[in-house]
Amino acid sequence: MASTASTGIIDTPSSHSVEDTVEKLKAILQAKGVKLFTLIDHSGEAEKTGLAMRPTKLLIFGNPKAGTPVMLASPRSAIDLPLKLLIWEDAQAKVWISYNSLSYLGERHGLSQQLLSNLAVVETLAAQAGV
């Protein structure tokens, strides 16, 4: 699976389970001093209602020092911030880390390269967590 230009979503493979990928991401976030605002367990919530869903978790994270200038320049960018990483398992039991591409966020909100660099941590996190 690769980046889909029409959706702006980048899919990066992980060589770990969903749970291990999430734990790895949490450790990396903590080491980098990036705040984890929340972790949403979509599959866990589905199970509570009697529905089956492959493992799917969403991390919402950020650094107000990096995100605030972006939102000041483009208030509507707050709909995409804090940053998000979706960790999910496909039908073949392959695990993926998905996130909005920086180019998509830049085009969507008219952000300069300088402001986009504030959000580049999302790419680093996905790369580090998948290996």
Regions from the language model: what does each represent?
Residues 2-33:
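Terminal, regulation- and interaction-focused segments at domain boundaries
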Residues 11-12, 59-62, 87:
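Short beta-strand element of the conserved SAM-dependent methyltransferase core
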Residues 23-24, 41, 73, 121:
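Short Gly/charged-rich anion-binding patches and loops
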Residues 37-83:
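Compact, glycine-rich, soluble single-domain proteins
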Residues 84-109:
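Beta-strand/loop substructures that line and gate deep hydrophobic ligand-binding cavities in soluble
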Residues 107-131:
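Well-ordered alpha/beta subsegment
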